[in-house]
Amino acid sequence: MKSLNDLPAPKSTTTTYYDHSNDAWFKNRVTESETVKSSSIKFKVVPAYLNRQGLRPKNPEDFGDGGAFPEIHLPQYPLLMGKNKSNKPGAKTLPVTVDAQGNVVFDAIVRQNENSRKIVYSQHKDIIPKFLKNEGDLGTVVDEEEELQKEIQETAEETKAAIEKIVNVRLSAAQPSNIARQSGDSQYIKYKPSQQSSAFNSGAKERIIRMVEMPVDPLDPPKFKHKRVPRASGSPPVPVMHSPPRPVTVKDQQDWKIPPCISNWKNPKGYTIPLDKRLAADGRGLQDVQINDNFAKLSEALYVAEQKAREAVSMRSKVQKEMVMKDKERKEQELRALAQKARSERTGAAMSMPVSSDRGRSESVDPRGDYDNYDQDRGREREREEPQETREEREKRIQREKIREERRRERERERRLDAKDAAMGKKSKITRDRDRDISEKVALGMASTGGKGGGEVMYDQRLFNQDKGMDSGFAADDQYNLYDKGLFTAQPTLSTLYKPKKDNDEEMYGNADEQLDKIKNTERFKPDKAFTGASERVGSKRDRPVEFEKEEEQDPFGLEKWVSDLKKGKKPLDKIGSGGTMRASGGGGSSSRDDDHGGSGRTKINFERSDRR
């Protein structure tokens, strides 16, 4: 065993026990950590909020135990938060690092900053070739060169073989592949024939033949057809997980119901298709109808404008009535003064005093009250003139006064009734007759259909806001008539008469002339139809033969029939299941046909061709 002294000296030495406390970088770090700890412990008295003029906090102890001061416009770092530590003077000192062999890595100085991500060659071994790095590898340089050349040769051969394979595939694709290859080899076969006589083959006992493969014409079509073999099935198909079957509901059936295709341009068979079916096929019902808010605003504005216009019209009519009343009152005052003057001149007495203006204003409320006062004045004057009257004149005067008094009481009564009706919201007789609807006027016979007025034709605006006419589509699609009503149906003179056909059952009804005379002598202008609930019967004039109405059903809800079925022992659910597959009605059938016959109530739909005009 060799001693340790015989070992060679190491190339590089490292100090195992290295005192790091003497290094400058260690002292700086230790002192910095101590100052930070001491700064976090020491506190400085911070001035009050309004007494911080001139305060410039830079050190951690200037902040006390709090944060930064927002009223001081300086960069502040309480507890050194946010401060860049790379600006410190001790940050440029690099720590000592060692490699795997324990040697100090001095090239850390070169590998810092921008060279930290780069490959830096800082040692002597980095410039030595790879195969000369080790001192004992000088004898193996030649072997490595031979191996390198051998590897290069193998790689070249593999590359050449791959390129030739690709080229041969391209060349064989351009050449025809169905040409059979013909081998030029021939075979010689020696055999003994069965006929050994001298008459065959010159008496030879053995024969030698040359067998050659029969040549193939390259232009012949192929004798065999290549069939494509289907590819074998691989793994079984992936199972599809289905949900369990559930019965189809009515809603699902309605959702799956697809409307028939109805064209808006073609109808070659002339089917009459209702509008609702066209709209269902058009798909307009799927669109949401959005109504603009301006329609409501417009209608409200029109209503307000109409109310204001009505108020203005009523105010103008009221003012006009007052002006007419004042004018009438003035004329009555003048006539009263003239009558007083005439009476005074006739009797020879002095003129009476004129009516004061206050009295005229008080009497201007009601003109009929002025007439009454005028009659009373005349009565008193006639009493003074009694000695000059005869007996007959007096009787006539008294009769006239009675008539005037009766008329005055009638006017007073009408005035009270009108005031009472106005307070209760009722209309007077004249206003009621004037504001009657045209249908009521026609029913009462008050409508003037002859047009005797001869003035300007007045139209009712309500007649233009109807759901019929050319502006509203005129008629349905399945109607081809030009007018919806008859032209002379509302004529009250001729249409009220029922005219029988001439020479129609003359033997049964008698002479036609007598019947016509009887019709002509009847009342023509008596209304044919009266109001409902009238006591008196209407005339027998008709515009058509007698029509009989069906008697109303006494049991519309079927209660008596139900009670009778219960008495007979029938149950309402006896007929369930007796119908077809499409019937699901319970509690008995829904029609008489279902009651009589079982089976489905479904019928065949027949389309009819419409008549084109």
Curated annotation (Swiss-Prot):
Residue segments, region SNW: 186-350
Residues recorded as bearing Phosphoserine in the entry: S235, S243
InterPro entries, sorted: SKI-int_prot_SKIP, SKI-int_prot_SKIP_SNW-dom
GO molecular-function terms, A-Z: pre-mRNA binding
Induction of its expression: Expressed constitutively. Up-regulated by abiotic stress and abscisic acid.
Quaternary structure note: Component of the spliceosome. Interacts with SR45.
Annotated family: Belongs to the SNW family.
Protein name: SNW/SKI-interacting protein
Organism for this UniProt entry: Arabidopsis thaliana (Mouse-ear cress)
